[in-house]
Amino acid sequence: MALPRPTSPHARGSNRTPAIMRLVLGACVPGLLTLTWLYGPGTLLNLAWASLVALACEAAMLALRKRPPGVFLKDGSALVTALLLAVALPPYAPWWLTLVATFFALVFGKHLYGGLGQNPFNPAMLGYVVALVSFPLEMTRWPSPDSALGLPDSLREFLGLATRPDAWAHATALDVLKTDRSLTVDELFAGNPAFGHLGSAGSEWVNLAFLLGGLFLLWRRLFTWHAPLGMLAGLFAMSLLFWNGSGSDSHGSPLFHLFSGATMLGAFFIVTDPVSGATSNRGRLVFGLGVGVLTYVIRAWGGYPDGMAFAVLLMNLAAPTIDYYTRPRTYGHRKAERGFKAGD
């Protein structure tokens, strides 16, 4: 009896790209619902619009590259990018801001380099940084959790029809801590509605929700613990090093930084990107540490309140070098070959 001899791989896993993307989308649901609960339906409007723009850009670029649109549109990667942008952008972002960020993420962050699996930078963070650098005023329109708008007002904000579009602008705790150095941190927490129990008001709950979703992905083994732990450890260590207990010039406590801004979103949904990050476990740990350290440096001394996106893009640049110096031991050799050799 002749036995079939199919080509390798003979052992097949269940983690195909569409299945992975569905898990990531599902893990973002707690954070998405928390954002909607605290800040109103603006985030859902961002998500719906970003998804339409992402799919349109994906289809157009696939057509230009003469690739079958049906196959690649179903993998869910464009929707994941749209979701990450939707939860990162302010809930009251105008429609054109979401369009610009999503367009740059899909076209310049993904397809310019060859599509899924070829991008050296995280597409969502690239689109976010383009929006932040180009339109800083619109990127600061975060409302207070106790003054969230309903659907009609959120829709007017989204369409740019509001009579006073800046009326609901609200400084986050990271903004206040960077600009108000006359008060101690304890005084800021006691007298400013931007601060919650651990970090920014509202942001601490959003971070807890994304932490829950990230732990679910970790439990499902979609990624290893190295990059998230490295990032959180780097951020924690830097904030602990410069924390003096009360002075506002210490830039906030370790817990404050862990539960403010986009910390947990970055730790579990951004730095774990298998394409733009490091590949070995040791490299992922170094990559995460670098993101955490750079995030704190930008938060404390940079020109932006939250430096997560910039930190990720800078470490994306360093990822090939990290991979080169953290190569695992090759089977049959006693130790890994590291560093550049003569003639390389």
Swiss-Prot record:
HAMAP family: RsxD_RnfD. Keywords: Cell inner membrane, Cell membrane, Electron transport, Flavoprotein, FMN, Membrane, Phosphoprotein, Translocase, Transmembrane, Transmembrane helix, Transport. The modification FMN phosphoryl threonine is found at residue 172. Its EC number is 7.-.-.-. InterPro entries: NqrB/RnfD, RnfD_bac. This is Ion-translocating oxidoreductase complex subunit D. Belongs to the NqrB/RnfD family. GO terms for biological process: electron transport chain; transmembrane transport. It is a multi-pass membrane protein. GO terms for cellular component: plasma membrane. Part of a membrane-bound complex that couples electron transfer with translocation of ions across the membrane. The gene is rnfD. Its cofactor is FMN. It comes from Pseudomonas aeruginosa (strain LESB58). It is found in: Cell inner membrane. The complex is composed of six subunits: RnfA, RnfB, RnfC, RnfD, RnfE and RnfG. The chain crosses the membrane at residues 23-43, 44-64, 77-99, 120-140, 198-218, 222-242, 252-272, 285-305, 306-326. It is an enzyme of class 7 (translocase). Pfam families: NQR2_RnfD_RnfE.
